[in-house]
């Protein structure tokens, strides 16, 4: 991908070239977007850029490995997160859904753009995965290829690292494209690439953790928000179309904010200039994003046309818009895994008393907060001095995000009217971070160039600059990168994974090939936990299984899947009779889903004659009882 803003001739986007002002905004009557600094360098990438980019990628890699303790092949082959028996952390359970998707996709069952069924889930049928839209099919498909290449757990680890590397690299290139100096672009890119947001969402929300397209949005927003807009069919127009289409292929939350701020910026410019071509260009960007969004939904929509709607598959209650709305104070709350025990303790204390919580990922980091406060200071100062045209565009963008997605904001009003898709407004904290970091790079680069005396600073000056850069990077790594797992925590994951793998192997050795296993407690899929059992915990044996079939995993809401819920209303003896009638060879029990650890159920099954020795996991939470009498 070439980000080179070559200056041979002015692009058709700009017909004249008035000088920019330092304050930002528009030069009065100019028709030229005003940069917060001089124009982009004559040659990009330069040797300094390549050295900085290579250093950036190495730094991000080492920081990521430090955060997860992945320093050898054995640790790379382990998941960085895995539910521990008896732990009802719903977010950590989501990683099992990720692993399930990658395994099924790697086996060829979940192909992009096609209807999706999984033969080994949803027994006695094939699991239907068509009613819940998968809006990130291309990233998921790439992840599945990584899982097939490196193994299920190692593949997702590689994907997580690539997400951080892409975020850092793209931000660096965008910052340099936006006239940022190499050093400031490096610092901001490191902060974005190691954002607490990405660490906290990976690996259980990998589609959310892929933040790398967001810096590209900043280019589009500036183009549409500044004169003369985007000239149709220019090089910039094609770049914007490509960015819009890329956004539509990724997480729908990011597609949403790209379209919102693109439309808002274009409408404001149209009100000032009445330039219909510029407005149409902005609408073309939104159309490109919409086209990709439609492509991602074709399988779901065509399945709906063929088999009717399933309103019960995807349920979004209004309460989550309140709970997971964007909250300004959460931008300042450190993560629970902060390297400072003092700050981590403060976060724990806050979460213990706060009535409304976020996804633990809104923290902007020290550098991000400094940039946010700087932007707020400049914007408020300009307003107080009645210099409204000097208020940075970025301040208005942040203001819109807060107005739209804060708890009780415009998004909540839409939710009250029935549109509850974007329930986690706190996820837009990463967009605020990207906006403020890039603004600080542009503004800081302007000041740096304005204060620079001569082109060849002396050794003392270079030493001061180098020390400042190193100090900033050390603060970022210390502040944003989570503390590494302890030996005890890693040993717990190893013990749980080994227990599940061995348990599944014993089931496959004891049951006929292709046998069906009925899972208790009865749970609906997706997003429906049971008391004591997180929503995707029943996927644990499937991750290590080769030929068994499991009752869990077909999407709820259709009559075909209702039989399990009806079964739960019968007596145990009647239920077992129905289970055997449908061809199941064993009953799998997660003991955590029963207040008495399912001991009465196991005792009753033995009394019914199913007295073959049960298969019990090493951790003691799983048991499998074959349904054949000795």
What positions do the PLM features span?
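Membrane-embedded helix bundles of polyisoprenyl
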Residues: 159-178, 182-271, 285-289, 293-296, ...
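Membrane-interface junctions at the ends of membrane-embedded or membrane-associated helices
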Residues: 5-6, 35-47, 177-180, 222-238, ...
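Membrane-interface helix-loop-helix junctions at transmembrane boundaries of multi-pass membrane enzymes
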Residues: 272-283, 349-363, 372-403, 453-460
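Membrane-interface helix-loop junctions at the exits of transmembrane helices
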Residues: 65-69, 108-110, 184-204, 292-305, ...
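Start-transfer (signal-anchor) and selected internal transmembrane alpha helices
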Residues: 1-78, 280-288, 377-395, 459-470
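Membrane-interface coil-to-helix junctions
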Residues: 61-167, 195-211, 324-325, 329-359, ...
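Extracytoplasmic
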Residues: 471-630
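Membrane-helix boundary/interfacial segments in multi-pass membrane proteins
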Residues: 81-87, 201-208, 312-316, 345-366, ...
